[in-house]
Regions:
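Alpha-helix boundary/capping and short turn/kink residues
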Residues: 65, 69, 131-138, 153, ...
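Mid-to-C-terminal catalytic subdomains of enzymes
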Residues: 101-146, 150, 235, 241, ...
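Core alpha/beta nucleotide-donor-binding catalytic domains of modification enzymes
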Residues: 1-126
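Cytosolic histidine kinase catalytic core of two-component systems
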Residues: 92-93, 136, 211
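Active-site catalytic microenvironments for nucleophilic, acid-base chemistry
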Residues: 40, 128, 197-201
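AMP-forming adenylation/ATP pyrophosphatase catalytic core
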Residues: 9, 29, 77-79, 123, ...
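Secondary-structure boundary/capping positions in well-ordered alpha/beta enzyme cores
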Residues: 3, 41-44, 136, 201-205
Length: 250
């Protein structure tokens, strides 16, 4: 290894400041550090060691939280700069490879702390399912995620096509959609177009929950002029002059 970079971060303090959970805080600071090093060494990819088991754990976590179908795809092999070269390899096979080649794996001790949701799924839930219901649960869940990913890709393509049909104006700080055409769409497309629009405007749709989406659909359906919603900090949705205004105020 040519260079090694490390950094000590007070995750608990970060979580408190951002008002998020410890697990999410740990993930955020980790990837912020990866991005920092990536820029420092002029790299264009960040390789992380997620494996097939991690993917299944993520699917189960998202299912327990009531995720939409996007979340049930699990971890993807590539997300922007992030690549996951061993995402299709089971943890057991990785451990066997290390053993056969006299490689000492670096194990995070916190992985055994079952107070964390992911660890409880990894150490308790999945072994229980394997023992009591389906010894091939990993492969079963992977097949499910592949079906979902295929259907989700189709829906995403459809959403992009419908979005272009109802798009009136797209600026840095606001997007305007045709109200009449939006109201004529099926509900599932309305929901996805709302998320797609917010994502285009703000670089992501974090913080936009099911209740916010339903409120926006209701606002558009009732078509009461000059009514607006603020579903998230810095985001305003306004219905006016037969248009839907998505306004980024940050």
């Amino acid at each position: 290894m040519k260079d090694f970079y490390s950094k000590r971060i007070e995750v608990e303090q970060y979580a408190n400041n951002k008002k998020i959970g410890l697990e999410e805080a740990g993930r955020k600071v980790r990837y912020e550090f990866f991005e920092e090093v990536c820029n420092k060494v002029n790299a264009n990819k960040i390789a992380v060691a997620h494996n097939k088991n991690d993917k299944v754990e993520t699917i189960i976590m998202h299912a327990l939280r009531g995720s939409g179908i996007s979340g049930l795809q699990g971890i993807q092999a590539k997300t922007n700069k992030i690549i996951r070269p061993i995402i299709e390899v089971e943890r057991q096979n990785i451990e066997e490879y290390c053993k056969q080649n006299n490689l000492e794996a670096r194990i995070d001790k916190s992985n055994f702390d079952n107070t964390y949701t992911r660890n409880k799924i990894r150490n308790v839930v999945i072994p229980y399912i394997k023992e009591e219901f389906n010894p091939n649960i990993i492969e079963t869940m992977i097949r499910l995620s592949e079906v979902i990913a295929e259907e989700n890709a189709f829906l995403n393509k459809l959403v992009q096509e419908e979005y272009q049909k109802i798009l009136l104006e797209e600026k840095v700080d606001q997007i305007l959609l045709d109200l009449k055409k939006f109201n004529e769409l099926d509900n599932i497309l309305k929901k996805r177009i709302i998320l797609y629009t917010v994502s285009n405007l703000r670089g992501g749709s974090q913080g936009i929950e099911k209740i916010h989406i339903e409120d926006i659909i209701k606002l558009c359906k009732n078509n009461i002029g000059n009514k607006f919603l603020i579903p998230n900090k810095g985001l305003k949705v306004l219905v006016k002059d037969k248009k839907i205004f998505f306004i980024n105020e940050e």
